[in-house]
Amino acid sequence: MADEVVKGNKKYTSGNSAYNAQEFHVRNLIMQHVNTATPVIVTAAQAGGAGAAAGYVTVKPLVAQIDGFGNTVPPVELFKLPYFRYQGGVAAVVIDPVPGDIGLAVFCKSDCSNIQQGQIEPVQPGSFRKFSQSDGFYIGGFLNKPPEVFIEINQDKSITITAAAGITVNAPTVTVPDGDVIASGISLVHHKHPGCQGGSTGEPT
């Protein structure tokens, strides 16, 4: 160990002057304690699905740290990060994360542990910590595998919905204000029933 050289992130000029040495130490202190964002993989998810509020994920950073000798320091899991859901008021698109998803963990300037679900009034930070990995949020949808269930909005002003297991619509009515509905090549508006005699009927029962 005596003849090993600690590489670290010291520059050739870091020891050339008192100013350079001080700049080196200050820069390293900042780099050690200020977290901004890092790519992560989801290892566990607490998600309630449709009808439930957005939940939390456990994630593991995908970029490892290295020590002064250049050795890899395995990353540790980060727990209970609130995950992003596309929502406005009571309307939302529910696509909850699952283990194996890749996303981005972003870290807050101050301790946000006192913020509760649905809170609308500001609160004091839970502590004096700054830019900590303990105050992270998860934003999903980066570098993932091709989807199998999806809604595709095209530039030709059409929308394609692909769902191999079927589609369920929970609504008292479905309104198509104009146009037609085509099912298996048959028009809802213009289809005909062969072999029928004319007459009058009431509403379907």
Predicted feature residues:
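Intrinsic-disorder/coil detector with helix-boundary
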Residues: 2-5, 12, 16-19, 164-205
